[in-house]
Amino acid sequence: MLSKDIIKLLNEQVNKEMNSSNLYMSMSSWCYTHSLDGAGLFLFDHAAEEYEHAKKLIIFLNENNVPVQLTSISAPEHKFEGLTQIFQKAYEHEQHISESINNIVDHAIKSKDHATFNFLQWYVAEQHEEEVLFKDILDKIELIGNENHGLYLADQYVKGIAKSRKS
């Protein structure tokens, strides 16, 4: 049986994942409207991935006979200065989500909730992967440059990542 604290934290995480999906959808839209189709595709796909993270949490809660408590999702940021800023914000956002997951893991350990601890190991690994991915993209954008030809090359680099993650 899940403790009240774990239930509260997992419900909050569902909403954080839904917010993440909306944020990446907003970033994707900005990219597409600025002819950055590669980054737009990557972020669009990533929005769907975040939605799947929320679904996985919902299923876990439901399997434990816990009703999910969805809250309102605030409007995501939609004005950005450029591709570097988008990926910097995305990287920082992933770090925030990692902290949140780690906090739930800490609570599961303290309450000796082995099932939740085991379930969350997938999220721990996933967050590590996402932080590495976004940091790598950010580093490449900064290396290539965010101006003219560099911006095009950076967009094509991100497009390549999006396509490789689908296969």
Swiss-Prot record:
Keywords: Cytoplasm, Iron, Iron storage, Metal-binding, Oxidoreductase. It comes from the Bacteria. Its EC number is 1.16.3.2. Residues 1-145 form the Ferritin-like diiron domain. It is found in: Cytoplasm. InterPro entries: Ferritin (IPR001519), Ferritin-like (IPR012347), Ferritin-like_diiron (IPR009040), Ferritin-like_SF (IPR009078), Ferritin_DPS_dom (IPR008331), Ferritin_prok (IPR041719). GO terms for biological process: intracellular iron ion homeostasis; iron ion transport. It is an enzyme of class 1 (oxidoreductase). Gene3D superfamilies: 1.20.1260.10. One of its GO terms (cellular component) is cytosol. The keyword Metal-binding applies. Transmembrane segments: none annotated. Fe cation 1 binds at E17, E50, H53. GO terms for molecular function: ferric iron binding; ferrous iron binding; ferroxidase activity; identical protein binding. It catalyses: 4 Fe(2+) + O2 + 6 H2O = 4 iron(III) oxide-hydroxide + 12 H(+). Fe cation 2 binds at E50, E94, Q127. Homooligomer of 24 subunits that assemble into a spherical protein shell (12 +/- 1 nM diameter) that can sequester at least 2000 iron atoms. Belongs to the ferritin family. Prokaryotic subfamily. Iron-storage protein. This is Bacterial non-heme ferritin. The gene is ftnA.
